[in-house]
Amino acid sequence: MRRVVRQSKFRHVFGQAVKNDQCYDDIRVSRVTWDSSFCAVNPRFVAIIIEASGGGAFLVLPLHKTGRIDKSYPTVCGHTGPVLDIDWCPHNDQVIASGSEDCTVMVWQIPENGLTLSLTEPVVILEGHSKRVGIVAWHPTARNVLLSAGCDNAIIIWNVGTGEALINLDDMHSDMIYNVSWSRNGSLICTASKDKKVRVIDPRKQEIVAEKEKAHEGARPMRAIFLADGNVFTTGFSRMSERQLALWNPKNMQEPIALHEMDTSNGVLLPFYDPDTSIIYLCGKGDSSIRYFEITDESPYVHYLNTFSSKEPQRGMGYMPKRGLDVNKCEIARFFKLHERKCEPIIMTVPRKSDLFQDDLYPDTAGPEAALEAEEWFEGKNADPILISLKHGYIPGKNRDLKVVKKNILDSKPAANKKSELSCAPKKPTDTASVQNEAKLDEILKEIKSIKETICSQDERISKLEQQLAKMAA
C-alpha cells in the first residue's frame, strides 16, 4: 500500500525567534537598493551592512554582544561608497571580504575579541572592476581564493595571499550578474543574470559548461545555487510575476527536473542551502516568512516542509554555518533576520525526546580547514571540503593572521595580456614553496627592521640619560 504522507525526519522542523534581550538592537540597517543579504555570520561574529554617512560601513559584533548597540560602536569603514555585499572566509573566522559601490573589494582582519576601534585599514584592497562590486564569495575549499562580480558584468577570481587577479571572466555575461555560487568542491561556478540565463562555468578553463535561456521568464531578479550532488537550484519569476523555484541537471538543461510556483509576492527569493540535510530555506526580501523545502532524488524532488512566519518584514538575512549551531538542542539552522533597526536570530529545531547526540541530524560537516592552497587550485587541483564531526560540539581553533605578499609589480605582465596568458593550456606551475619562503623572508626582514629601529631609539635614550646623569654629577 502506498503511503499518503511522505516520511521525513524534517517534517516537524519548527522555527522560533529568540527573546528580545538576545537580539541586536538599534542598528541602522543599510537602505541601499541591492538584492544581497546584507548580513554574514560565522561561529564568532555577526556582520551587518549599515547606513553610513560619507562612505560605506558594516558592523562586526561578537555573537554574545546582544542588546542595544551604542551609536558610537566601532565599524569597519574603509570604503568610499556604500557596501553592497560581505562574506566571511570559511577558513578563518576573523577574515571578511566586502564589495562596494566604490568599485573595490577589501579584505579585513577582525581582532580575536572584536573591534575596540573602528577599522579603516584593510589587509588588502583588490582593484580590477570598473563598476560597483555587488557580489563577493570565498572559494569553499581553497585557502585565500576569492571571487568578485561587478556591474561591469565581469567575474574576477583573486589570490588574496598575493593580491593578484588571476582569472578575469569579462566576456561571458551580456547583462548584470544577479548572483554567483561555487560548487561543493569549487571546481565550477553557476550564475544567474539579468539576461534571464543561468550559466554553469568552469572558471579555470574559462568555458561555459552549460546554460539555460529563460530559466525563469519573468523580468525580476533570479538566483542560482549549486547543490551537493551537482544539480542547480534556481528561484525567479514567471511571466505572470509568480515566484518560482526550479531544479536543474547541468548535463541536460532543456527542461527542469522540478518547477514549482509559489505566490505573487514581488520580493526576491534568497536561497540558503544546507548540504548535510538537503534542506533549502527561502527568504524573500520584504517577506515576513521563511519557507523550507527538502530536496530528494524521488519525485517531485523538491518537497515543501513548512513555513516560519513572523510579523515584521525582513530587510536581509544571515545564515550560520553548521559548525556554529547548538547540537545539544537539535538546532539544524540559525538565521539572523534584519529588521529596519535590529537583527533577530531565528532558530530552526527538529523536535527530539532524547538528549543524546543525533547522528542522523548531524553527519560530518565542512570544517574550517582548507583542503587546498590557492596555488594548487589555480594549477588545476580539486578537493572536497575537509569534514569534521559535531558530536562533542565545535571548538574553534586559533586562526592564523592573513598575510598578503605582493609580488614585484615589474614581474607581472601588463593587464591586457593577463587573459591570454591565463587561457593558454600549458601553464608553468607556480612554485608554492617559493611563494611561502618569500612570505617568511619578508616577515623576517620586517622583524629585523623593527629590531634595528628599537635599538636606535634605545641608544638615543641611553645617551640622553647619560648626559643628564653627567649634568647632575657636575
Swiss-Prot record:
Q: What does changing R28D do?
A: Decreased actin-binding. Loss of actin binding
Q: Give the WD repeat ranges.
A: 78-118, 128-168, 172-202, 215-249, 263-303
Q: How does it sit in the membrane?
A: Peripheral membrane protein
| Any one GO CC term of the record | cell cortex
Gene3D superfamilies in the record: YVTN repeat-like/Quinoprotein amine dehydrogenase
Inactivation phenotype: No visible phenotype. Fibroblasts from mutant mice display a disordered actin cytoskeleton with a reduced width of the actin stress fibers. Likewise, these cells have several microtubule-organizing centers (MTOCs) and a disordered microbutule network.
Q: Which residues carry this modification: N6-acetyllysine?
A: K446
Tissue localization of expression? Detected in skeletal muscle (at protein level). Detected in fibroblasts (at protein level). Ubiquitous.
**Coiled-coil regions in this chain?**
435-474
Family to which this protein belongs:
Belongs to the WD repeat coronin family.
The record's subunit annotation is: Homotrimer. Binds F-actin. Interacts with RCC2. Interacts preferentially with nucleotide-free and GDP-bound RAC1. Interacts with VIM (via head domain). Interacts with MICAL2; this interaction recruits MICAL2 to the actin filaments.
User: Which protein is depicted?
Assistant: Coronin-1C
- Report the source organism: Mus musculus
